[in-house]
Amino acid sequence: SKDYINESHGTFIASTIQYGNKLNGIIAANSKYKFVDIVAIPNGDKNWGPTDGIGEEELMEIIEEVMEKYSSSTKIWNMSLGIESKVCDGSMSDLGIFLDYIQDKYCVQFFVSSGNLNQLPLREWPPQDDMGERDRIISPADSVRAITVGSVALYEAKDSIVRSNEPSPFSRRGPGANYIVKPDVVDYGG
C-alpha cells in the first residue's frame, strides 16, 4: 500500500547519482540515467507514517521477480537496507549469498550499504577496545559480488569523535566473511 512507503533514502541516493557532480561542484558530462523505482520493503520508520515489514524469504522472492522483469535493461541496482540483527560473524548471510547468486544469474551489479551503527556509543577512530564486533558490517553487506559502500567524515568539529577523512562513527566496518575486504568503497556521509 502507498501508505507504507518511505521514499526518503532511495530518493536521496538516486538524486546523488543523477546530480552528484553538480551537488559537489564537479564539472562533468551532462549524463542522464534511467531509474526504476522498486519499493520492496514497507516503511519501518513511524516518522514516515504507518509501518509494516516483510521477512527475508519474501524479500528474496521480490528481488527474483524484479530481476526477471527488469534485469535485461537495468544493470545497476542500489539496495539501501541492512538487517541489524545479522552482524557479519565470519559466515555469509543468506541474503548476501542470494545477492551473489542473483548478480551471477542476471549479470547485474548491486550497491549495498555497509550498514549504520544505530546505538551508542558510536565508534571512535581508531576504534576503542570495548567496541568488540558490534560495529561490523551487516547483511547483505557481506555479499562478495556486491559493492559495499561505507562512510567517511567530511568535516570535524571541536567535539567530533573522528577527524575528517576517518571512518564515520556510525558506518559499519569489515572485514566480511573469510576476511574479505569490506566496505569496497567509501564516500563522505553523515
Where are these regions (language model features)?
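Active-site-adjacent bridging/hinge elements
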Residues: 1, 34, 75-76, 190
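Subtilisin-like serine protease catalytic core
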Residues: 1-55, 107, 142-145, 155, ...
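Structural signal for hydrophobic packing residues in well-ordered secondary-structure cores
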Residues: 21, 67, 103, 157, ...
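Substrate-binding/access-modulating region of protease and related hydrolase catalytic domains
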Residues: 41-143
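Extracellular S/T/G-rich loop segment that most often corresponds to the catalytic His/Ser-adjacent loop
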Residues: 129-190
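Generic recognition of flexible, low-complexity loop/linker segments
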Residues: 2, 23-24, 65-66, 98-100, ...
